[in-house]
């Protein structure tokens, strides 16, 4: 049996939502396209096994792009996209001992790098004493495919 819960997000498109999917005793959280995470949403996404979570931009890198100012402002506001630091902070507040993998998603091609997103998350988890050898961190490729192998499919 599978259960899917929709969680409200903050984006400049109507009715933007994330998902909490539970099946086979495991929980996956999928959140992209949001400028911030409300506290009631944080409560719903605590201690998932897997997170696919937006880490859209590095603020300094974004500001150095050739994008128009209004686009940059749209991206960094509360109904835009999560920057690396905010994403890492939220993740450090919600992951738990059952968390096995974090996939960083929606990484901007112009305003971020996979290495930058990964480094910020790794540093934040380390600073809070949350980095573990059994916790996988994976910054997703823009057009790649990443397989999350659940506990029943682990090789």
For every predicted segment, state its role.
Residues 39-138:
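Cap/insert and terminal regions of metallo-dependent hydrolase folds
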Residues 11-13, 59, 144:
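Residue-level detector of flexible, active-site-proximal loop/helix-junction positions
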Residues 8-10, 54, 141-143:
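Residues at the C-termini of beta-strands that transition into short coil/loop
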Residues 33, 107, 142:
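Cofactor-binding loop segments of dinucleotide-utilizing enzymes, especially the Rossmann-like FAD-
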Residues 135-155:
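Short, basic/aromatic-enriched C-terminal tail that caps enzymatic domains
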Residues 1-50, 148-155:
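Core dinuclear metal-dependent hydrolase active-site scaffold
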């Amino acid at each position: 049996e599978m259960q899917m819960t929709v969680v409200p997000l903050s984006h400049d498109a109507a009715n933007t939502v994330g998902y909490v999917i539970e099946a086979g005793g495991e929980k996956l959280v999928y959140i992209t396209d949001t400028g911030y995470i409300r506290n009631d949403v944080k409560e719903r996404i605590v201690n998932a096994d897997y997170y696919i979570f937006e880490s859209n931009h590095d603020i300094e890198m974004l500001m150095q792009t050739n994008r128009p100012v209004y686009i940059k402002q749209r991206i960094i506001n509360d109904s835009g996209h999560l920057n690396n630091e905010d994403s890492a902070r939220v993740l450090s507040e919600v992951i738990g001992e059952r968390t096995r993998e974090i996939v960083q998603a929606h990484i901007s091609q112009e305003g971020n790098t996979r290495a930058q997103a990964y480094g910020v998350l790794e540093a934040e988890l380390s600073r809070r004493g949350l980095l573990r050898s059994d916790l996988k961190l994976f910054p997703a490729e823009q057009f790649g495919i990443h397989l999350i192998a659940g506990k029943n499919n682990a090789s």
